[in-house]
Amino acid sequence: MAVRPAALAMLLALGACLSCAAEPRLGVFYFPGWRNDTPGAPSDRPWEPIKAFPDRQPRLGWYDEGQTSVMEQHLSWMAAHHISYVVFDYYWAGRPILAHAVQAYQASRGRQKVQYALMWANHDDTRPRTLSEFDGMVADVIDQHLRRAEYLKVQGRSVLMVMVPGFLEARTQALGLAPGALLQRLQQGVRQAGLPELMILAGAGAALNEVTRQARRWGYAGYFAYNYHAGVDGRTRGEMRASRSYLELDEDYRSHWEWFLGQADLPYVLPLTSGWDMRPWGGSADKQHDQSISTPAEFTLHLQAARKLMLAHPAKTLGLGVVCCWNEFGEGSFIEPTQGYGARHLEAVKAVFGAPASGSPP
């Protein structure tokens, strides 16, 4: 019987993701913003605003991020609680900045148990300013990261996330290039280095928008999200607003999951959240949005729903989920053990993602 090309592609994807179905993998985003006097950090003394919220004090204390001993403990906790990989926020300002945390990872023994990937946090819509600057970033990513054995691969391809695809495409056009040309240039650099093409994921929200319409054309292989604040089309419970409780935020995330798994043209790494409460950094525009931080019990239900979808859709999710975040203390998105919350959120991860894949979620 002849197999149509589209059907063949889906069969190949399903075959490649059989291991995903057997063992869904959960990762976590890591914000490298907790070292004094570091260009790119929230301030010269980034811990100071957090100290007004003593329940958020890390169990390790107000540490100097970038020390290998700190990263060793982080990785030990991750591995012990079934976090398979960590995604470091990657910043480029003509040179890498806030790279101290990933460098500590690379120097640690724990990297053997927890893989890593990069998310290019391209908040700056003026970068790259030139092709040579972009080429410098490509060289840094290749030489400092993609050649490493512990870098996260899916179907044999290293995973790179781009937080704001629209900004990158705007810079592509500003440099006088065709749509998707910077991503093509990145892939060309990777091939010339003798490495397999990247699996580049686009940060996106649900519904038809510029990113979900153009991602495949631009050269992306799938979608992800760092975080969401509302549901599909910016609505929470039918109103144009952000969530005002974790229950609402969980509902909002599930609405994005449903849309992507049902309608998106590319795979979708399932995003999860421990919550949102930005009061240490001045608070959200809608103050009630800062009531969206989770209890361990609420977070457990969120994890269970995500795991169920990852098991049901191994090809569409690539068998991957990623939590925001390990340590976004200023935004209230963290699962790193703290004085006030202990390790209860991590224990929830272990309870849910440590369960046998062949069984029902706990």
Go through each PLM region and give its residues:
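Positively charged n-region of N-terminal signal peptides that target proteins for export
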Residues: M1-P5
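Bacterial N-terminal signal peptides
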Residues: A7-C17
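Glycan-processing catalytic domains of CAZymes
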Residues: A21-P362
